[in-house]
Amino acid sequence: GVMVQYPGDGGRIIDYRNLVQVLHSRGIPVAVAADIMSLVLLVPPGQWGADVVVGSTQRFGVPMNFGGPHAAYFAVREMYKRYMPGRIIGVTVDREGGKALRMALQTREQHIKRERATSNICTAQALLASMAGMYAVYHGPDGLKRIASRINQYANALRDKIIELGFDETNNDFFDTLRIRIPASLSVEKIKSFAVEEGINFRYFTDQTIGISI
């Protein structure tokens, strides 16, 4: 199989339709890791042939929480529904060096009494899923479109100002992420130092470009 990101890693929106057609003609399924907020405005992956779509629901009203926890979403075509795993059994080695099987991934990992549990991060994903779901219900389709459109408008306003300042924005099509090319005359390290002082978190690529997400 093949997995692609939508929008791409650097923020660019890529039209994968031709790629998906070629892959499907060779019997290769396509999975997509997609930003759920961008899907409010973009053509859904299922409409251009994706077989599996996954991603995080954090952007639907869930705080960053220093990186987690956040609930995920996982969607497949009808033909793959029975292949969605409830539990995945992995191969490992026991203490005597022999081959052993163990549960490597499952939807619920707590098999001890609540009083003895030291964490509840796995089963607590239901709370995050409920928060994201109710965020969508509360705002409704029109409200979500207004939110996503406002994010995109902010990104476009920032892009216009950056171009006005003489910088090159390399993402022709984007939702909320810009990739700015820094001239050789400017030091990326100086920009990074200034950004840290101002509490601004940029992404620094190795090709003299900087990523900015709204």
Located regions from the model:
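Residue-level recognition of alpha-helix initiation/capping sites
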Residues: 13-14, 36, 127, 142, ...
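Generic serine detector
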Residues: 25, 38, 56, 119, ...
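Active-site C-terminal subdomain of aminotransferase-like
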Residues: 60-165, 170-172
